[in-house]
């Protein structure tokens, strides 16, 4: 059987950040931004999961008590747990879809609850005129709701609609919005998706009057001049409508799922209007197809990305202690096999420009059979695995002007617990099926990098990766 390999001369990013230097706020060095994305943790899901049909946001109620929000079948659910990432408890319905003919006749989705005083305020995505099997037909709009305990929510008040009428056989309207609270400004900003142009827009309202539709104004021709209900709006481009606020950098964070960009795209803005996009994806992927006949067959699927403060809840974050959430369908899965994933993020400005801004954690897991799996992907059968250690950080895209190698993961056709990491094309002819690209490595040594080696475990009878030639005393170098 042909064995593929990764040369021990490939190099990946160091585990440790460079020393921080103070950068003047008025001169932000975009290429000095350094982001480390940690291993993905599967916290909920499996066959016939009823929810996970929206961005997953979390609020903190008290010490050791958090509440997250999911949706499915047109209704919104709350899930309570002791930590932001501990979301395995039963889901409770907290908001139901509206009556026939209403803006929410097809469903409601609670997005991005934020705390204002003693009240939790949430954007509520609404849909009407739906016929999903007819080209995904639906018409989107947005409401706002509030709650004192995160369980009892008032019926949403519609505050944002499109000037266009519903269309047959396609998505229309404006929706899928997320809220962000501006520090020291007294405004709530709502970033939304406009399917007719496949772009994003923004509206805002004073915190003191967010429940009044007339208070919400869309950005149009550079000013907050248009009514959010039925008004026109400027295009922000395709930055995404999943947002948060980075307090250390005083910038809005926007996330988008963009296969043409190469994965989860991160954009930042200091004025709520003009965004720049980080050149590297946070998590790489090249396909994101919702075709029910293709899901799980040719690749995995990432959907509904969100921003969560893992320590305090909400979506206002610091350099560390926050993460992204998303719904995940693994390679070989179906639309009913959805998993909720939390993935920690550390982000800061360093003293010099970076060749690559993002590093993605490569982690070794041990199966109860003794076999190792080394991956950057979510491990969905997590109860069968023990997390062992982070090996290094991989690149999330090729670096221009420097030789890199694409790294892919594959699984043995005869043994679903036997995984192989190889360079691109190495799965072919090896008796394995390709799962996905899990990152890139430098072909030759670079500053602040470490080598990785392919090793063989006689106990598990499979290959794994290590950052040292001693293979962490778990096996021997594989020189094939």
What are these regions (language model features)?
Residues 1-10:
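Bacterial N-terminal signal peptides that target proteins for export
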Residues 301-313:
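A short, acidic, amphipathic alpha-helical segment used as a generic capping/interface helix at domain edges
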Residues 354-480:
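Extracellular glycan-binding segments that recognize GlcNAc-based cell-wall polysaccharides
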Residues 21-25:
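Boundary at the C-terminal end of the N-terminal hydrophobic targeting segment
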Residues 26-106, 115-169, 182-240, 245-297, ...:
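Beta-rich carbohydrate-recognition and catalytic domains
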Residues 55, 108-110, 174-176, 238-240, ...:
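Conserved positions at the start
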Residues 9-18:
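Bacterial N-terminal signal peptides
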């Amino acid at each position: 059987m042909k064995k593929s390999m990764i040369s021990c001369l490939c190099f990946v990013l160091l585990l440790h950040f460079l020393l921080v230097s103070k950068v003047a706020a008025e001169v932000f060095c975009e290429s000095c931004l350094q982001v480390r994305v940690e291993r993905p943790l599967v916290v909920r899901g499996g066959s016939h999961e009823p929810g996970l049909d929206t961005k997953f946001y979390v609020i903190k109620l008290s010490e050791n008590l958090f509440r997250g929000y999911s949706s499915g079948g047109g209704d919104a659910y709350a899930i309570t747990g002791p930590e932001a990432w501990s979301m395995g408890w039963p889901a409770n319905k907290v908001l139901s879809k509206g009556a026939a003919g209403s803006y929410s006749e097809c469903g409601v989705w609670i997005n991005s609850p934020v705390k204002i005083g003693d009240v939790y305020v949430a954007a509520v995505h609404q849909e009407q005129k739906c016929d999903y099997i007819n080209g995904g037909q639906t018409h989107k709009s947005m409401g706002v709701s509030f709650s004192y305990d995160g369980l009892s929510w008032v019926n949403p008040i519609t505050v944002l609609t499109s000037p266009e009428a519903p269309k047959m056989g396609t998505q229309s309207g404006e929706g899928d919005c997320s809220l962000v609270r501006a520090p020291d400004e007294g405004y709530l900003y709502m970033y939304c998706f406009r399917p007719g142009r496949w772009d994003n827009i923004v509206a805002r309202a004073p915190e003191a009057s967010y429940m009044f539709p007339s208070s919400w104004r869309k950005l149009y021709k550079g000013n907050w001049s248009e009514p959010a209900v039925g008004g026109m709006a400027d295009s922000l481009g395709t930055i995404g409508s999943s947002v948060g606020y980075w307090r250390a950098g005083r910038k809005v964070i926007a996330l988008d799922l963009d296969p043409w960009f190469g994965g989860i795209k991160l954009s930042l803005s200091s004025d709520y209007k003009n965004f720049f996009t980080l050149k590297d994806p946070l998590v790489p992927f090249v396909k994101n197809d919702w075709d029910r006949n293709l899901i799980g067959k040719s690749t995995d699927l990432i959907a509904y990305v969100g921003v969560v403060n893992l320590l305090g809840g909400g979506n206002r974050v610091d350099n560390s202690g926050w993460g992204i959430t998303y719904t995940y369908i693994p390679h070989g899965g179906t639309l009913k096999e959805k998993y909720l994933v939390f993935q920690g993020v550390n982000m800061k400005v360093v003293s010099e420009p970076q060749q690559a801004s993002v590093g993605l954690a490569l982690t070794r897991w041990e199966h109860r059979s003794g076999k190792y799996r080394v991956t950057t992907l979510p491990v969905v059968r997590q109860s069968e695995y023990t997390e062992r250690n982070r090996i290094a950080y991989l690149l999330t895209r090729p670096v221009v002007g420097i030789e890199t190698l694409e790294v892919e993961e594959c699984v043995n056709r005869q043994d679903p617990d036997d995984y192989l990491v190889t360079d691109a094309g190495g799965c072919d002819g090896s008796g394995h099926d390709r799962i996905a690209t899990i990152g890139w490595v430098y072909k030759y040594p670079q500053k602040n990098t470490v080598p990785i080696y392919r090793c063989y475990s006689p106990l598990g009878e499979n290959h794994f990766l290590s950052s040292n030639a001693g293979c962490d005393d778990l096996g021997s170098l594989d020189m094939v």
